[in-house]
């Protein structure tokens, strides 16, 4: 078996990636989220495949086909809720994975980090298009509002929006193409994940100290396979509790009303995992400015290697920047809350303050904190 593991062309690749992979001996549970994201992606592809067998991407039958899945298909309700809540679990793991990367300075592995940002955009695009498919009120109006933002692009904006819609409004053509893209994107994401792992294995994993760990590496299997398995069990338990006991807690009641272009819901908002970006978008009165801020809220992650001023890689031994980091986390939670609130006083001013704070902490305060810590170290 060992000879086959090390000699067989295909198994050899798996061996170097998941079995004999030299891994730092001190990586904590924060490094579990990569494997959990792999599990989430697998769950989403499998449940999505079974949903696609029964779903029809036509405006007249989309809503009723989802109802049919829940009522008439064997365990259709379970497949549908696993897929819907699986997206939420996916984003929870994604945000924690990115947060770990920021905290421990993993952005210094530039190729892996940039690949991760591309993956984040791809997953966000997939989730957005998936939310449109049930063709409820929030599906329709969410699609209308978000795609309409592209009309802010000077000169070509309106033409671009109509090209994406396939007409003069969100209609049959839009739903069909969104279904096609929603189906193909997870497979593109899977390919990108392999590239992400390829880049990661070029440099090896980071660790909580941020120091070079070449002198103290252990094989991935069995040490981290068993550790990942524990993480998987915890995730699956949380996932099944969410799916079986609180399936609708993260959804919007408006989406149980069929899409009606003549009736606008009082509060149009995306799924919870987009609310922070939606709050940043709404905090700027100008349409183009809002769109740019929305894009920049994710693209700013690509600039983190340039904004790194500290002599140390991680925040483990940097209390000032640690404080800034946790203020940033709190700020993102505030933005998520504001994104779900109506556009009125005091939510407008809170959203604007939180949006300014978000960019200021990343671009100004964290780099300054790094320089202050460098000076403190020099004094010692």
From Swiss-Prot:
One Gene Ontology MF term: ubiquinol-cytochrome-c reductase activity
Keyword hit for Mitochondrion: yes
Record's subunit section: The cytochrome bc1 complex contains 11 subunits: 3 respiratory subunits (MT-CYB, CYC1 and UQCRFS1), 2 core proteins (UQCRC1 and UQCRC2) and 6 low-molecular weight proteins (UQCRH/QCR6, UQCRB/QCR7, UQCRQ/QCR8, UQCR10/QCR9, UQCR11/QCR10 and a cleavage product of UQCRFS1). This cytochrome bc1 complex then forms a dimer.
Residues annotated to bind a ubiquinone: 201
Q: Which InterPro entries match?
A: Cyt_b/b6_C, Cyt_b/b6_C_sf, Cyt_b/b6_N, Cytb/b6-like_sf, Cytochrome_b, Cytochrome_b_C_euk/bac, Cytochrome_b_N_euk/bac, Di-haem_cyt_TM
Binding residue positions for heme b b566: 97, 196
What are the binding positions for heme b b562 in this chain? 83, 182
> What keyword terms does UniProt attach to this protein?
Electron transport, Heme, Iron, Membrane, Metal-binding, Mitochondrion, Mitochondrion inner membrane, Respiratory chain, Transmembrane, Transmembrane helix, Transport, Ubiquinone
Provide one Gene Ontology cellular component: respiratory chain complex III
Coiled coil (UniProt feature): none
Q: Which cofactor does it need?
A: heme b
Name of the featured protein: Cytochrome b
């Amino acid at each position: 078996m060992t000879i086959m593991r090390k000699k067989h062309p295909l198994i050899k690749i798996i061996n170097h990636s998941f079995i004999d992979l030299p891994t730092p001996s001190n990586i904590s549970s924060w490094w579990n989220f990569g494997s959990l994201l792999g599990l989430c992606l697998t769950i989403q592809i499998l449940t999505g495949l079974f949903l696609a067998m029964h779903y029809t991407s036509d405006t007249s039958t989309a809503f009723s086909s989802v109802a049919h899945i829940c009522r008439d298909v064997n365990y259709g309700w379970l497949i549908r809720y696993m897929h819907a809540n699986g997206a939420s679990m996916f984003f929870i793991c994604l945000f924690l994975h990115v947060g770990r990367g920021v905290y421990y300075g993993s952005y210094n592995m530039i190729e892996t980090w940039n690949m991760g940002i591309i993956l984040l955009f791809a997953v966000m695009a997939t989730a957005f298009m998936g939310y449109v498919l049930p063709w409820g009120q929030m599906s329709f109006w969410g699609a209308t509002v978000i795609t309409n933002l592209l009309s802010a692009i000077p000169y070509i904006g309106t033409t671009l929006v109509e090209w994406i819609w396939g007409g003069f409004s969100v209609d049959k053509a839009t739903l069909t193409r969104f279904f096609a893209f929603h189906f193909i994107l997870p497979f593109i994401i899977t390919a990108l994940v392999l590239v992400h792992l390829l880049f990661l294995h070029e440099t090896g994993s980071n660790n909580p100290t941020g120091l070079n760990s070449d002198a103290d590496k252990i094989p991935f299997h069995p040490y981290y396979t068993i550790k990942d398995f524990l993480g998987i069990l915890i995730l699956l338990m949380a996932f099944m509790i969410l799916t079986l006991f609180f399936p609708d807690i993260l959804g919007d009641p408006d989406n149980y009303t069929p899409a009606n272009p003549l009736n606008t819901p009082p509060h149009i908002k995306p799924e919870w995992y987009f609310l922070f970006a939606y709050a940043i978008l709404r905090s700027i009165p100008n349409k183009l400015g809002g769109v740019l801020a929305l894009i920049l809220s994710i693209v700013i992650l690509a600039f983190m290697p340039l904004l790194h001023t500290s002599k140390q890689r991680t925040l483990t031994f940097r209390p000032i920047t640690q404080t800034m980091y946790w203020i940033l986390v709190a700020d993102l939670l505030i933005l998520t809350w504001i994104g779900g609130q109506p556009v009125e006083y005091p939510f407008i001013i809170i959203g604007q303050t939180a949006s300014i704070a978000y960019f200021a902490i990343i671009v100004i305060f964290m780099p300054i904190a790094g320089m202050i810590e460098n000076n403190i170290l020099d004094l010692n």
